[in-house]
Curated annotation (Swiss-Prot):
The gene is Inka2. Residues 59-104, 178-201, 230-288 are annotated as: Disordered. Enriched in the nervous system. It comes from the Eukaryota. Residues 93-102 have a biased composition (Low complexity). Residues 246-256 have a biased composition (Basic residues). The keyword Nucleus applies. Residues 140-183 are annotated as: Inka box. This is PAK4-inhibitor INKA2. Keywords: Nucleus. It comes from Mus musculus (Mouse). PANTHER family: PAK4-INHIBITOR INKA1-RELATED (PTHR28615), PAK4-INHIBITOR INKA2 (PTHR28615:SF2).
Length: 300
């Protein structure tokens, strides 16, 4: 029991010593952390002071430094005159500081000159940055994707519906043709070797011709409804009559195949009902055509 108690006492002493050492280490760490925080705060203050000094230098401190030198100039003779009695010693003492004070003026003037010389150096990078920013702003709108998205449709953005190909072709037809001249001028103005100039020009002309032909063909397929209504008021009647005739034929085939009792009339009476819309006058069909438009069904 005595040995165990002695061992326990030794362990407890060691633990106490370790705890004391840990406390000392913790105090040292706290002191170090406090020192580090103080150093960081001092660095922040120095950064703020340097920024303020730079602002003062760029703002206009030379106007304040030069008057200080002019104010300090008359202080020397006043102090010299009030210092000692009138005599040759006083004159000599007054003459010596006057010579000493004279070189101070050009030094301060030189300081003012340095500050004045620093101003354009600090202002030049800002002007250069503004010029570069303006240059980037002028370069960005030349992107062909932005022009396509902005000029492809005047009223709506480029939205692809179910008929994607028709939508894209319609947007291509709506594009202005004036941009082609600028693009041709840009491609012609680019520097190319002599052997490839003729080939590139021929390819460009062929592509332009095919594009113009394709565009004219598509525009002829997609007519302007308002213009055609003014020139030919009844231009939509034959297409509508054909569509109606086709629908009536389909209805007739279905009725004959199914044999349903929907049409109680005899077979002799059916063609009468079918022939009436085909032989009807265009005036009777015009009010019914107003609700349906072929252009809206094909072109988005």
């Amino acid at each position: 029991m005595t040995k165990e108690s002695k061992d326990m006492d030794c362990y407890l002493r060691r633990l106490k010593q370790e705890l004391m050492s840990m406390k000392e280490v913790g105090d040292g760490l706290q002191d170090q952390m406090n020192c580090m925080m103080g150093a960081l705060q001092e660095l922040k203050l120095l950064q703020v002071q340097t920024a303020l000094e730079q602002l003062e230098i760029s703002g206009g401190t030379p106007t304040f430094s030069c008057p200080e030198s002019s104010q300090e100039q008359p202080e020397c003779p006043r102090w010299q005159g009030s210092g000692g009695p009138a005599g040759p010693a006083a004159w000599t003492s007054s003459s010596q500081p006057s010579f000493d004070s004279s070189p101070k003026l050009p030094c301060r003037r030189s300081v003012c000159g340095k500050e004045l010389a620093v101003l354009p150096k600090t202002q030049l990078p800002e002007e250069h940055q503004s010029c570069t920013q303006q240059g980037t702003e002028w370069v960005e709108p030349d992107d062909w994707t932005s022009t396509l998205m902005s000029r492809g449709r005047n009223r709506q953005p480029l939205v692809l519906g179910d008929n994607v190909f028709a939508d894209l072709v319609g947007n291509w037809l709506d594009l202005p043709e004036l941009e082609k001249g600028g693009e041709k001028g840009e491609t012609g103005g680019s520097i190319e070797p002599k052997g490839e100039k003729g080939q590139s020009r021929e390819l460009g002309r062929k592509f332009a011709l095919t594009a113009n032909i394709f565009r004219k063909f598509l525009r002829s397929v997609r007519p302007d409804r308002d213009r055609l209504l003014k020139e030919k008021p009844g231009w939509m009647t034959p297409m509508v009559s054909e569509s109606r005739a086709g629908r009536s034929k389909k209805v007739k085939k279905r009725s004959l195949s199914k044999g349903s009792g929907r049409f109680p009339f005899s077979s002799t009476g059916e063609p009468r009902h079918i022939e009436t819309p085909a032989t009807s006058s265009p005036k009777a069909l015009e009010p019914s055509c107003r609700g349906f438009d072929i252009n809206t069904a094909v072109w988005v």
